[in-house]
Amino acid sequence: MINIRKTHPLMKIVNNAFIDLPAPSNISSWWNFGSLLGICLILQILTGLFLAMHYTSDTMTAFSSVTHICRDVNYGWIIRYMHANGASMFFICLFIHVGRGLYYGSYTFLETWNIGVILLFTVMATAFVGYVLPWGQMSFWGATVITNLLSAIPYIGTNLVEWIWGGFSVDKATLTRFFAFHFILPFIIAALAMVHLLFLHETGSNNPTGIPSDVDKIPFHPYYTIKDILGILFLFLFLMTLVLFAPDLLGDPDKYTPANPLNTPPHIKPEWYFLFAYAILRSIPNKLGGVLALVSSILILILMPFLHTSKQRSMMFRPFSQCLFWVLVADLLTLTWIGGQPVEYPFITIGQLASILYFLIILVLMPATSTIENNLLKW
């Protein structure tokens, strides 16, 4: 009997990607986060679609429409909080996924890695424009502050900002276009994710040892489908605990105050997942310098394959590099904490030191440590 799974043009693609895909036999739970990101994206698109059915992108009614969703729409409150906290889950999975790539040297798959960095930028852009939509105080002022950073670009900066705003300030035109961007970008992310997978399946997955695993492959289904389902269950457990018990734990109280252009909140800050980049931005007193540092903090990931000086791919057998990696993680957590603090002593100094350390570890210390390890192993 002909197996339709292996002959049908569409089924064949699914089969080669999720069923008969040869996968390394030793990949750990750190490899679960790719599939979790896919689930997060599907969840965000579905909850977002239902929210968009009731949302109005007008400055006069946006805040009221979000209130209406929570109060009057059947299960609107759970859809809204699943969407808001789903974004947090998305970024937790993203950061772990990128961290896994750094630790195990997955960045040597150049095309996959570069598309991953583009995906990271796109997801960050989507989250930013989405944060503006409820039109609370933090939405309005966050949009004003972050879009204003583009005015630091020499010569065209001011015109560029006014072009993005659609006027001389963040207003109705800005909200409408941000809603349009927020609707289209997830589908662009989905398309990019498919390209990401396409390039990954050209080379096959990396594994914790960083050694080619062609001699020892197992089919993706049932082994890793079961493993992924376990990860998905944990994801939903964590998400629904957050949604049902502490839906506003990760949010800012100012988003429950309607936007008021005449009243600036005491502390303008983005959602928690942008705080590390915000801290780097604030640690440089110059506007253009801050913007460049902000962009560089993410763009630096593109340099990772070229900064790899070790003879080994993974950090699994490199204890000094491992220590440095965890110092980098601690540094990013410090930056996240600093980003949420007011701009005053000692937070300014801590932020500046943490920002310098971030770039120092990636650009200097990691390549140097790898070279030292090579020499110690007489390679």
Curated annotation (Swiss-Prot):
Gene3D superfamilies: Cytochrome Bc1 Complex, Chain C
Highest taxon in the source lineage: Eukaryota
A single BP term in Gene Ontology: mitochondrial electron transport, ubiquinol to cytochrome c
GO molecular-function term, one example from the UniProt record: ubiquinol-cytochrome-c reductase activity
Transmembrane segments: 33-53, 77-98, 113-133, 178-198, 226-246, 288-308, 320-340, 347-367
Keywords: Electron transport, Heme, Iron, Membrane, Metal-binding, Mitochondrion, Mitochondrion inner membrane, Respiratory chain, Transmembrane, Transmembrane helix, Transport, Ubiquinone
Gene Ontology CC entries for this record: mitochondrial inner membrane; respiratory chain complex III
Membrane topology (UniProt): Multi-pass membrane protein
Cofactor: heme b
PROSITE patterns associated with the record: CYTB_CTER, CYTB_NTER
Job of this protein: Component of the ubiquinol-cytochrome c reductase complex (complex III or cytochrome b-c1 complex) that is part of the mitochondrial respiratory chain. The b-c1 complex mediates electron transfer from ubiquinol to cytochrome c. Contributes to the generation of a proton gradient across the mitochondrial membrane that is then used for ATP synthesis.
Quaternary structure annotation from Swiss-Prot or TrEMBL: The cytochrome bc1 complex contains 11 subunits: 3 respiratory subunits (MT-CYB, CYC1 and UQCRFS1), 2 core proteins (UQCRC1 and UQCRC2) and 6 low-molecular weight proteins (UQCRH/QCR6, UQCRB/QCR7, UQCRQ/QCR8, UQCR10/QCR9, UQCR11/QCR10 and a cleavage product of UQCRFS1). This cytochrome bc1 complex then forms a dimer.
Other observations noted: Heme 1 (or BL or b562) is low-potential and absorbs at about 562 nm, and heme 2 (or BH or b566) is high-potential and absorbs at about 566 nm.
Protein name per Swiss-Prot or TrEMBL: Cytochrome b
